């Protein structure tokens, strides 16, 4: 969920070059940790994203406000009921299906437009006659623009850095220059995935 919160921060005036101190912090009884327990000190949010620094993400969310961020991330198609009302939201503690995540990330790739994914394009009857066809929302034509195109571009570039320099380097094996996305893991590395 880090990219969605960073997008909200960009909307509030942050830039990829905004520096946040990656250092231990406590918010009441909550003390976020980075994977591996290390800290990088002052770091740009761009680098914090591609290195997947949890503490920086939580600090950014705290600075922009949980309520604002919850409202903002709904622009990516996530239902409010599945978005936590606390700082753990940025670390992916809510509920989202893989399809919802793909739809959310597509906003960055589509210039800020929220499309509706579909699986079935056409249905034919037993006589070969077309009986139904999907009419999807098309980015730039019928889909709603839910974030500023500059924001979408900045986030797309930041997500490309995840592939070039960060935790998603394995995707370089595909030999494509347009890949952008984010890795994700659960506590204790039980589950891992990539979306983008």
Regions found by a protein language model. Name each.
Residues 1-8:
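Active/ligand-binding-proximal structured segments within catalytic/core domains
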Residues 8-9, 56:
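Substrate-binding cleft of carbohydrate-active enzyme catalytic domains
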Residues 10-18, 79-81, 110-115:
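Secondary-structure transition/capping motifs at alpha-helix termini
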Residues 14-69, 86, 114, 126-154, ...:
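Conserved catalytic neighborhood of penicillin-recognizing serine enzymes
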Residues 19-21, 90-92, 122:
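Soluble periplasmic/extracytoplasmic beta-strand elements of cell-envelope proteins
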Residues 31-36, 65-103, 112, 119:
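Mid-domain, small-residue-enriched loop/turn segments at the edges of structured enzyme/sensor domains
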């Amino acid at each position: 969920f880090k990219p969605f919160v960073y997008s909200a921060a960009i909307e509030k005036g942050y830039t990829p070059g905004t520096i946040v101190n990656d250092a231990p912090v406590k918010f009441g009884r909550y003390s976020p940790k980075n994977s591996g327990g290390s800290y990088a000190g002052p770091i740009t949010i761009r680098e914090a994203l591609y290195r997947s620094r949890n503490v920086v993400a939580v600090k950014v969310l705290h600075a922009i406000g949980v309520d604002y961020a919850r409202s903002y991330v709904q622009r990516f198609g996530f239902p409010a009921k599945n978005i936590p009302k606390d700082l753990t939201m940025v670390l992916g503690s809510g509920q989202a299906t893989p399809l919802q995540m793909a739809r959310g990330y597509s906003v960055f790739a589509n210039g800020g437009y929220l499309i509706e994914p579909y699986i079935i394009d056409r249905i034919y009857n037993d006589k070969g006659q077309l009986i139904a066809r999907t009419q999807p929302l098309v980015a730039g034509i019928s889909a709603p623009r839910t974030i500023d195109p500059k924001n979408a571009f900045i986030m797309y570039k930041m997500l490309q850095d995840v592939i070039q320099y960060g935790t998603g380097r394995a995707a370089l094996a595909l030999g494509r220059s347009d890949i952008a996305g984010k890795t994700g893991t659960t506590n204790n590395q039980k589950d891992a995935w990539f979306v983008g």
